[in-house]
């Protein structure tokens, strides 16, 4: 496998996960996009905002390509207090989705322009680990996005029962009801 085909494969996997994350917002109210669904406040719009922040950082700033748009929560360091993980009342979902799409475009330019072995520096990592490569950061971003796409699938399912992308391909409502009953019986055997 050549470096360029590996880069193309990583880019494809990244885009599939990006698309999956945004698909979890479809058809939801502003409230449902924003409301915390777990004890750690996981929410769909916050996942999108976080991923936009991470892409601008890892696939932009760390390779000498600063974000073309301001990220106030990075500039004022409130990101360190979780400000990238939720949407303020005055931040529109359209703004956050567009911020994520802008991060994609910026990252896609990095992917097109940089070799996987291009040097990179992550200033917020411990000094002994700061020097790395673009390829390492691209793999990290693919993993980060896939990780949060899974969170988005589960969060969406908690909101309205809509599962991941292949949920309906696996079975209809009755199939899922029977499946959940089987899984519950197996768990109940260990009460």
What role is predicted for each listed range?
Residues 1-6:
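Short, contiguous pre-domain boundary segments
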Residues 7, 11-25, 30-81, 122-191:
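Short, contiguous alpha-helical
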Residues 67-108:
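Helix-adjacent hinge/juxtasegments
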Residues 109-116:
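Glycine-rich, acidic and aromatic/proline-enriched surface loops and short helix-turn segments
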């Amino acid at each position: 496998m050549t470096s360029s085909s590996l880069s193309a494969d990583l880019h494809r996997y990244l885009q599939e996960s990006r698309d999956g994350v945004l698909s979890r917002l479809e058809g939801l109210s502003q409230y449902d996009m924003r409301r915390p669904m777990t004890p750690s406040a996981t929410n769909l719009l916050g996942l999108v905002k976080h991923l936009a922040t991470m892409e601008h950082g890892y696939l932009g700033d760390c390779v000498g390509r600063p974000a073309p748009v301001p990220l106030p929560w990075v500039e004022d360091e409130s990101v360190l207090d979780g400000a990238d993980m939720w949407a303020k009342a005055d931040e529109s979902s359209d703004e956050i989705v567009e911020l994520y799409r802008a991060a994609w475009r910026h990252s896609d330019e990095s992917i097109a322009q940089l070799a996987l072995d291009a040097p990179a520096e992550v200033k917020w990592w411990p000094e002994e680990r700061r020097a790395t490569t673009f390829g390492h950061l691209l793999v990290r971003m693919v993993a980060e996005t896939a990780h949060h796409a899974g969170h988005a699938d589960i969060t969406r399912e908690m909101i309205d029962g809509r599962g991941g992308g292949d949920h309906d391909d696996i079975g209809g409502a009755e199939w899922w009801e029977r499946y959940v009953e089987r899984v519950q019986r197996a768990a109940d055997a260990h009460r």
